[in-house]
Amino acid sequence: MLEIKNLHVKAGDKEILRGLNLSVTKGEVHVILGPNGSGKSTLMNVILGHPKYEITNGEIFFEGEDLTALKTFERARRGIFLSFQNPEEIPGITVENMLRTAKQSITGEKIKILAFHKELLALMKELQIAPEYASRYMNVGFSGGEKKRNEILQLLTLNPKLALLDETDSGLDVDAVEIVSAGVAKFHNENNSCIIITHNAQILKHLPVNRAHIFLNGRIVKSGGAELVNEVSEHGYAPFEVES
């Protein structure tokens, strides 16, 4: 599904990703672990085409198509979704209107307003989001936990092929992480894939982790199975710095 080869990326004069390789097959869940500033969020943004970053070398293929010439909205229409670490507030646009418009843009099909409203409220109930939030402006006045659950609401509503989740669990209490984890598990199936950045193994409890990758200084220094998540939880990143 996703193939990244020898990816070099810079922002301004600073090189951030240094020869990164990553392959994600349909149906897989990949976890990215690494200290702050190691390039994890940069990778997510580059996959979706953030204009801040410049690819100086390498390739990104999604379902066999080279993404590097595509704009952000074109990549989103291909089925790529990014859940932001710090979701932005968008005054003037309600949650329901934004999600309905986004889904219509991605699918190219006209969305029936009443049917969509009913489906949205059902998802909101599962995520323990009060129904009145559907008519509130996107993330305006939302708490940190409400913003993160709203990201999962977007994920479930838009149903992308590839979900990029950038610390969707950060800053959440135990109960909120459980809700988010269950929401991601509800989304994931054999026809889509997830790449998850996290420092908290709890969000992974409902997910079958296929591969875990250790990020250091803009590179993947080690890849393995779910056991890497436990190794990092117990020993931190120092052992991998020695290996790299």
PLM regions and their residue ranges:
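Conserved hydrophobic segment flanking the Walker A/P-loop of ABC-type ATPase nucleotide-binding domains
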Residues: 20, 24-26
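Conserved beta-strand-loop-alpha-helix hinge in the C-terminal portion
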Residues: 215, 219-241
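Walker B catalytic motif
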Residues: 167-168, 175
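ABC ATPase NBD Q-loop/coupling interface
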Residues: 59-75, 139
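ABC ATPase C-loop
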Residues: 155-156
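The feature captures the beta-strand-to-loop junction immediately N-terminal to the Walker
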Residues: 33-35
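Q-loop/switch helix immediately C-terminal to the Walker
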Residues: 86, 92-107, 119
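Conserved structural motif at the start of ABC-family nucleotide-binding domains
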Residues: 2-4, 17-19
